[in-house]
Amino acid sequence: MKTRTLVAVLAIFAMVSGACGGDDETDAGTTPATTAAPAETSAAPAADESAGGSAMSGLDIDAVLAADLDACVDAPSGDPIRVGMAMDFSDVVGFVDIPGSKLVPYVAALINCAGGIDGRPVEVRVAEVGDDAALATQELLDWGAQFLIGPPFADFALPILQTTGGGVPLFVAASTEPTLADMSINSYLVTFDDHGMAGAAAKWALDEGITRAIVFTEGEGIPYTGVNPDAFAAAFVAGGGEVVSTQTYVWAADTDFSAQVNEIAGISENNEVVFSAALAFQVTALRGQLEGQGLDGLTYIGTDALDATGISVEANNEGIAHTPHTSISAGDPIDTLLAGYEAANGEALESRGFMALYVDSMFLGIQGILDCGCDDPAGIGEAVQQISGFSGLSGEITYAGTNGIPPKAVPINRIVDGADVLVATIGG
């Protein structure tokens, strides 16, 4: 499949200029379109279309979130800050990369509406990796991207890193794969990794007084679908628990668990915790089949995949726990940002708990530029490696003293009376 590219700056320009009095309108909320070698476009409104006022200094996240696209300050006119997004729109991770690639240009529009970064406009270009992540990456580098936001899985992230030669910062926004964090090649997670996530799930189960576990895996050591169960089992046993059954399945595909259920029914005491990295529809299907065998006392906890695939709206979801990247409450900064996007674009973004990671990826790259006072990717990367205590939308982020995995607390959410609520926070 040919690599498809999008100049998200076009959407930003249309969004902001339309809000500030321009005549042309572009629907920036649609799935990115296919274009070839797009032209560069400023991401800021023209100066004579602004409402005037003073621009923000540096990166002021509060000012960005408060920006009103109907009342922008004077347009930034300095050299642009260029953000490249190499995104995977496939069925495997498109449910996070697609909405993420829509939100980041919108936030860039808010930055520019607030006057830019010390008078510099922020431009965003999105390239779909398709079947050639290297080509998509090269297009972004040729455009002048100073840092990149990448897809969550190694099969596309590694070709991106091979193309950059480790010389350009890459924030793998939605990834929890520990192998993708390596500051020596400028590769950074923006959240906790699989070990932190699964370990927190195990601790929560133990704290609930559960001492027996049933684990579903795709196989030992398999990225994400095997590593998370491995990490859960290790932490659960280390904490005094026992894994009484380990079952295999096909991630994102299986919904008939009759063989596994029959085996579990023979050993279960109906008081175990069931852990997997399965998708929401798989967990609820498994639960229904286990309940059909009379096993209605089990506790279910899963990974960030449950948040990404809509556990909060699945049938038979009551009591299911999961580990989202952010626990969003009404009126908080993330909720306000997503509501603003929806109002501006007429579309509610999916995978809400992941969206702050994409925005923080852009913020972190910009902070690196501010800290180094430079535009070259190598210098930006050196500055990113020294970031400590950065207050992002998704929480506090520190890279100094790490290998690119920020030490972050893991929220535990649970469906309680039909609502997805925070019930614990582990670590941090």
Predicted regions and their residues:
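Extracellular/periplasmic periplasmic-binding protein-like sensory domains
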Residues: S187, Q289-V359, L370, V416, ...
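Solvent-exposed, acidic/polar segments of extracytosolic/periplasmic ligand-binding ectodomains
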Residues: A47, A51-D70, S388-G428
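An alpha-beta-alpha
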Residues: F89, S187-A252
